Design a protein with these regions (language model features):
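Short glycine-centered segments of the SAM/dcSAM-binding site in methyltransferase folds
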Residues: 97, 157, 181, 240-241
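A short acidic, Gly/Pro-enriched loop at the edge of an enzyme's catalytic core
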Residues: 211-219
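Glycine-rich phosphate-binding loop and adjacent beta-alpha segment
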Residues: 223, 227-298, 331
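C-terminal hydrophobic helical "lid"/dimerization subdomain
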Residues: 2-3, 280-331
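Glycine-rich beta-strand-centered segment in the early N-terminal region that forms part
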Residues: 25-42, 56-104, 223
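A structural motif shared across PLP-dependent enzymes of the aminotransferase-like
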Residues: 102-116
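Mid-domain Rossmann-like dinucleotide-binding core that forms the NAD(H)/NADP(H) cofactor-binding site
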Residues: 132-204
Length: 331
């Protein structure tokens, strides 16, 4: 094992070319920590928000004029193998294949340290490292939106707006696993993909406006966030639930949070329930997701794979907003 490892860091906010692949000291592990040799990671919209410092709210968290130490790293998903464990670690041993994530980011690196009680569990044997690394953040978001916020039940009609992206591909599959009748909204090139994930109906938004079909849904998982709130409410049943997961980065100061704020204000005065949230990583939900993966009720969808040396290109591609499933980094 060498004394240095390669990792992605950045010292200023800006486009993908601010990212550097640097040599850093090997992470030290404490008595309750695990050293993981990262084999694959993935990128998420939150990565480019932090990279660019946009919306401005991000800078209040990460540093105003430039990212502070600890906030200048990217990547929240990973899969790899255990290299070493602290003396108090009983759950893992060297050689174990694991997957999970880091709340504080930093998985775009050759090695990371993780607490044994952190968001890390054994990798499903039926997945490659690349497939496993594509799962955590997107699957957590879809799971928590459907199960916790929408409280979806078997037989309900669920519409997923943005069905072909990272979160959307998991949302379609999980909604089906929960017994819902699922409609996915996507563009023409992705219709077959969304249908293959189990969607009962697919709406091609380039030829049909899903807000004007006259159909009503019990649950709308709005990942794209590309329609006016009044339009999305129109497709909900009178007591339906709209869960806002994301949306375009409109507004310099708080970006998509402005839409979330409008939902919070409006929800108490209408019969429909309008919910917005930010997903949180936790070990219990990772175990739930792992079971769905092992039983093949859910499968990861990977659009493109890039090496660690091409993270800038990967995030640039993700920023374009047309990824089919996840964008993965091999390490």
């Amino acid at each position: 094992m060498g004394c240095t490892v390669k990792a992605i860091r950045f010292d200023r906010y800006g486009p993908p070319d601010v990212l550097d692949l640097r040599d850093l000291d090997m992470p030290a592990i404490g008595d309750d920590e695990v050293l993981v040799r990262v084999r694959a990671a993935s990128v998420n919209p939150l990565d480019w928000h932090f990279m660019r410092g946009e919306p401005f709210l991000v800078r209040m968290l990460a540093g105003m004029s430039r990212p502070r130490a600890g906030a200048n790293q990217l990547g929240a998903d990973m899969a790899g193998s255990v290299e070493a464990v602290g003396k108090n670690v009983a759950e893992f041993r060297a050689g174990d294949e694991v997957f999970g994530g880091l709340e504080d980011r930093g998985t775009l690196a050759e090695y990371i340290s993780v607490r044994q009680d952190g968001v890390v569990v054994s990798k499903p044997a039926n997945l490659t490292f690349e497939q496993a690394a594509s799962v955590p953040v997107a699957a957590f978001t879809a799971l928590q939106a459907l199960r916790d916020k929408a409280q979806v039940r078997a037989g309900q009609k669920v519409l997923v707006n943005g069905a072909s992206g990272g979160v959307g591909t998991f949302a379609v599959q999980l909604a089906k696993a929960f017994g819902a009748e699922v409609t996915g909204v996507c563009s023409t090139p992705n219709v077959d993909l969304v249908a293959s994930l189990g969607a009962d109906h697919v709406v091609d938004y380039t030829g049909q406006d899903f807000t004007r079909t006259g159909l009503r849904y019990d649950v709308l998982i709005d990942i794209a966030g590309n329609r006016r709130l009044a339009d999305t409410r129109r497709v909900l049943a009178p007591t339906g639930v709209l869960v806002g997961v994301g949306g375009p980065n409109k507004g310099r100061w708080i970006g998509p949070l402005s839409r979330m704020a409008r939902m919070v204000v409006l929800s108490p005065v209408v019969s429909q329930r309008l919910v917005s949230f930010l997903a949180h990583q936790n070990k219990d939900d990772l175990l739930v997701v792992r079971e769905f993966l092992e039983t093949e009720k859910v499968r990861p969808v990977i659009d493109k794979t890039y090496p660690l040396t091409e993270v800038a290109e990967a995030i640039g591609y993700l920023e374009e907003g047309h990824a089919r499933g996840k964008v993965v980094i091999t390490v």
